[in-house]
Curated annotation (Swiss-Prot):
Taxonomic lineage of the native organism: Bacteria, Pseudomonadati, Pseudomonadota, Gammaproteobacteria, Lysobacterales
Assembly and oligomerization: Part of the 50S ribosomal subunit.
One GO molecular-function entry: rRNA binding
Keyword flag Ribonucleoprotein: yes
Protein name as catalogued: Large ribosomal subunit protein uL6
InterPro entries the UniProt entry points to: Ribosomal_uL6-like, Ribosomal_uL6-like_a/b-dom_sf, Ribosomal_uL6_a/b-dom, Ribosomal_uL6_bac-type, Ribosomal_uL6_CS
Entry-linked PANTHER family: 60S/50S RIBOSOMAL PROTEIN L6/L9, LARGE RIBOSOMAL SUBUNIT PROTEIN UL6M
Main function: This protein binds to the 23S rRNA, and is important in its secondary structure. It is located near the subunit interface in the base of the L7/L12 stalk, and near the tRNA binding site of the peptidyltransferase center.
GO biological process per UniProt: cytoplasmic translation
Key words of the record: Ribonucleoprotein, Ribosomal protein, RNA-binding, rRNA-binding
Length: 175
């Protein structure tokens, strides 16, 4: 069996997991997440511990994937996820207009980004954007969409980058 799927998931206090025949539901302080359950993966709840196993050898990797997704769902409804973006460049600014994000990224017009349902955007400063939510995949997708408005370029490093991202710099052309 998969090493990932072998590891049991402990459910923290304040989180409720329900396993139906076709759906997994996780309820917590921050919200509710659901995931369609495959017939090829067995999910057994024993008190506050979840264990997963594959029905046959060909679905071992699926059991590992479902275990990782379930673990992220439990973490999301209890703690939440966030991605931080930094704006690097002269005149690059971010501000909030209600729930929408207004970006000035050197274009002739400002960009207005409307976040999807379940995603919160914050701007602690004019050069920082924080994407928060309970669904890890959606938080990453929204952060990637915002970053793609002006990805960092390798010569000066200008653009929108993740806070943990290191930009590989190139040397300018020599005359």
């Amino acid at each position: 069996m998969s090493r990932v799927a072998k590891k049991p998931i402990s459910i923290p206090k304040g989180v409720e997991v329900s396993v139906q025949s076709d759906m997994l539901t996780v309820k917590g302080v921050k919200g509710v997440l659901t995931f369609p359950k495959s017939d090829n993966v067995n999910v057994v709840m024993d008190g506050d511990i979840l264990t997963l196993s594959a029905n046959d050898h060909s679905h071992v990797s699926l059991a590992g994937t479902v275990r990782a997704i379930l673990s992220n769902m439990i973490k999301g409804v209890s703690i939440g996820f966030e991605r931080k973006l930094e704006l690097v460049g002269v005149g690059y600014r971010a501000s909030m207009q209600g729930k929408d994000l207004n970006l000035s990224l050197g274009f002739s017009h400002p960009l207005l980004f409307v976040p999807p349902e379940g995603i919160n955007l914050l701007t602690p400063s004019q050069t920082e954007v924080v994407v928060q939510g309970i669904d890890k995949q959606r938080v990453g997708e929204v952060a990637a969409k915002i970053r793609n408005f002006r990805p960092p370029e390798p010569y000066k490093g200008k653009g929108l980058k993740y806070a943990t991202e290191a930009i590989m710099r190139k040397e300018a052309k020599k005359a």
